[in-house]
């Protein structure tokens, strides 16, 4: 039955990545050399990329992805050749066709190019201390930075060179150089195009561990250092125990300006982080655990196309929660708790509860096509499918497998086997399932796998079956929520502030559970307007997770107007951040809770600060 299951899964997705115009399957990329020169005056990058290729199929041309690039020249084996830039397609850009001799098995292709003002991968801004540029290539924006096989199916070792009057970081290990305004980097581990990155600005660094520095502009450096130095090395050591040794030499991180559209981006050797993590309370360090976990899941072992994005993110959330649970257990052990291991698992489950709530909310509000694990992205934009689905539904699928196969002790050996088997490679969902059988069939567990509902988990939209959670750490939260529900239904004594002992994750669970419960109740706005007085700590919080949930609760049920101070304050906050996790729901909240006109008015006021990816997605949300 094993082969039948795997073969049936194979038939449900595209054999080749549908989100690339390139003919990547005809070549193996031996090595890539990328040089980029930053011009802050023209807000462009001038570049040259050199590919050493092995022709696998007697191909007579190399077809690369480009988007809004100015192609200046192309060479094959050192000789200039003509090229053809095909018409632009709305999502996938313009294919670049370069003729080659089909009889030559190994060739070198060189392209000179310049980015344009339509580049979706880079953003030039004025930083805190001077001009600044950073890139963000996931999912298919690398093609607007340089001509490439823009698919996660293709991985290559790189050498990078950056020229700039300001400090440069790229996706590799810094190499010594005496050349002025020149920075060299080596990446010996093969990486896909979406992990290629360049940042340039007045950057300084501070140590946060024996193999880790944090980079940022000077005004925020000390705050960044404090936020991460307590946990960084512990995170790495625990991850190494779960998977295997960290292979990337150093794990450095870069806290970007506020317009960075994501929580973090797992750039090899230089993880990019949003400044919204610098909350002064270390409550959001799990994002660092998440980005670290990508060093194995996503970076070493990569999804072969964006249709299988869950293989990157589901695994990463799984490893992240294992790391967070292990850290909690270690701290409990230091405090002398006899139930330290049990407590660590309770912490993992508490994070799972928050994850389930996010998954349920996404399944309720998001495009149903994109609430499956394995997607159909033919003629589709991967950015449109970006949500919590691959993260949380992917996690719960892996947790389901862990549970069915016998728990952590039975699943941990598979983790090491899987990541060892596929490191430096890209894979699809069928290969993952095949590897499960390969590992567990000799252990007599094939029947367990046969009974997994693969169809529902992989190809059906919506919420999967809810697992049983250890709610020990959530009970205190639920008790306070129940008091509010009873008060709204029956009146009586007004609940007070019983959140003083809540940890950050408990505060988040309280706010989102209350918001969810109130959907089915007739909550009077006057009650909601008492909340800022009862819970002043939420109104004063600098933590983006709290700010977003707090305002969702108040604006959803308080019947505020656009002129109310609370609404004006939230609208102003949206103009100080660029993280899409907060920005997109924030504008949808203003549209639903205040008015469409007000949401558009606020967006038009601040759209110039947002990254091109974020700007495009909010426009779609509000259209």
Curated annotation (Swiss-Prot):
One annotated GO biological process: peptide catabolic process
Regions annotated as coiled coil: none
SUPFAM superfamilies: ARM repeat, Leukotriene A4 hydrolase N-terminal domain, Metalloproteases ('zincins'), catalytic domain
Annotated signal sequence range: none
UniProt-listed Pfam families: Leuk-A4-hydro_C, Peptidase_M1, Peptidase_M1_N
Binding site for a peptide: 136-138, 261-266
InterPro entries: Aminopeptidase_N-like_N (IPR045357), Aminopeptidase_N-like_N_sf (IPR042097), ARM-type_fold (IPR016024), LTA4H (IPR012777), LTA4H_cat (IPR049980), M1_LTA-4_hydro/amino_C_sf (IPR038502), M1_LTA4H (IPR034015), Peptidase_M1 (IPR001930)
Cofactor(s) needed by this chain: Zn(2+)
EC number: 3.4.11.-, 3.3.2.10
Active site location: 291 (proton acceptor), 391 (proton donor)
Molecular-function annotations in GO: aminopeptidase activity; epoxide hydrolase activity; metallopeptidase activity; zinc ion binding
Location in or out of the cell: Cytoplasm; Nucleus
Family: Belongs to the peptidase M1 family.
Function statement: Aminopeptidase that preferentially cleaves di- and tripeptides. Also has low epoxide hydrolase activity (in vitro). Can hydrolyze the epoxide leukotriene LTA(4) but it forms preferentially 5,6-dihydroxy-7,9,11,14-eicosatetraenoic acid rather than the cytokine leukotriene B(4) as the product compared to the homologous mammalian enzyme (in vitro).
PANTHER family: LEUKOTRIENE A-4 HYDROLASE
Protein's name according to its UniProt entry: Leucine aminopeptidase 2
